[in-house]
Amino acid sequence: MKVETFSIGFGKPIVSWKWGEVKWQICFFLVGGYVKIAGMEREGDTKPQDIPQGFYSKTPWARIQVALAGPMVNLFFALIAFTTIWLLGGREKPFSHFTRLIGAMDPQSELYVNGVRPGDEITSYNKERFEGYKDLVYAAIINGRPTNIEGNKINYFKETKVPYDYLLTPYDSPLIKQGLKTIGILTPASYLIYGKQSGNQKGSIFRHSPISSSGIEPGDRLIWMDGELVFSVEQLTQILNSGKALLTIQRDKKTFLAKVPRLPIDDLQLTEEESTEIGDWQYEVGLQTKKTEIDFIPYMISTNLIVEKGVFFVDKDARMTHVASIPPTSQLDIPLQTGDRIIAVEGLPVSSARDFLKALQTKQTQMIVKRQGKINPILWEQEDIAFENETNWADLLPLTASIGLSNPLRQNGDFYLLNPVIPTRLKDFPFPQDMKDEMEGRVKKEMARVNKIANISVREAQIEEIKRYRNQLMLGAEFQDRPVIYNPNPFVLYGDVFREITRNLTALISGYFSPKYLGGPLFMVQVMKESWGIGIKEALFWIGAISLNLGVLNLLPIPVLDGGHICLSLIEKIRKKPLERKVINWLTIPFVILLIFAFIYLTYQDLARLLERFF
């Protein structure tokens, strides 16, 4: 066959030259390539079979061999790229990419109700070995049907594991983009290592952040906050915005921490006498806010901080609820009992009801960090074992037990209790003015979109969501994950990427996965640019992954693709006579149009994603 053009890459040629009768060119998208053979495109009224040395002038078997050559080069090139990565020692990736530990959960999910919490372990889903959070996303997307999930509930202090096994139905995720589903697990676990860019460096947006006065140092790992072990930034945000106060309680001769709802006083069902008494406390401590803006807890207490009774209150769904019926969302959600004595509010000792009322008006966060040397990368296969075993969790207990006492313990082993932090609402955070203007512009744009929604209930719900977003509390810290070395043998990596391709295709064909989440040509350019910025091994991975994608897609039985040419050649071999040119055109033209539309659609989605970053 006569080769007319040999192209390295796709798109517009960057450079081209003639060598003999063949045009050689290097194109803009340096992934894969193609060979243009005489006769593959129509030349006047000449039959394709009559073009000398043309593609259709050869036997079906010869054409199949030629059609296979391109995809096979792509597939082989991917293997070469993955082998090179393996020989270079693998890629450095975040701990969260491969961990089997849970980072954050939806408190309304069935899995959460069954007692699974952040920090617990997943071992399998649908009876298949669990390799990482991506497996759960695919399981929910592709199946959309009940998912079997197995794992272990971990008690880090007692070093025990209790197995669990549940069958759960995926539902729309409250955290991920609309159209994607979850079974209640929102993010994988990660390390929360306070980075240098979060410190008091000149020009840092975090320079005057709330956490800057806590005594935290670069390299510190946040372990515990307000009564809970912290396994992800998302969980940290949930704890920070839970609307609960951390109280130190004395019951009989024992002292313990408990989390109690902090509510607007107007939401509490109080008698006139009880309301008047709280008003007197407000006057005595000189709180200038309106009484309706005061926060309190759903308990009545005496002047010397003895719990007298629980009270009813209006919950977020406008239902009258008693404090005793609140479902627990934390191990510290312990209902207070008559006779309990409150001795501290969020670490601040109090001795009277008026002191308690004053302290309750200001949210303070208690945090414990693990102070250690540089954390070196480890192999991904050992990361969860290291997460569990490299920390002496029991050393936390003396620190947590002293919170709220007159002389709290500040250090025990590698653990340090930080100074209390008063978090700031997002809308009040001291961002640079240009960032503030950008954020306000986004909010106004989103409000304009929401105000056009015809459905009143949907519109009001989204307006409330925007308000919650602007009022969410934040520490003003940027945390880094622990790096791990991911270096499976090249055939395993090849198989992983191939399996991901087939899962995506299956989800697209079945309708469970929207094509708007796919990447187009601009996405590939963006990925390649970012990967080269990370390093040559990351760039090699994406070159190999894209090449493997192109090889697999090219083998699909679609006319105009190599897989389509193979199918047409097989049909000709079975029929023992060539197909008419008009039949080939009839089969090919619709798919050419479809591919053009797909290219335009994916490019549009790429542009939309890019513009989201700026507007």
Please provide the spans of the model-predicted regions:
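Small-residue-rich helix-interface/hinge motifs
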Residues: M1-D50, L548, L553-R575
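Short, flexible surface segments
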Residues: G20, V31, P118-E121, P218, ...
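Internal alpha-helical transmembrane segments
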Residues: Q25, G33-A104, N155, E159, ...
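Interdomain regulatory linker/hinge segments that flank or connect interaction modules
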Residues: G44-T84, Y125-Q178, M225-I294, I501
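Structural signature of transmembrane alpha-helix termini at the membrane-water interface
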Residues: L79, T83-R91, L505, I509, ...
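Short extracytoplasmic
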Residues: I102-V137, G215
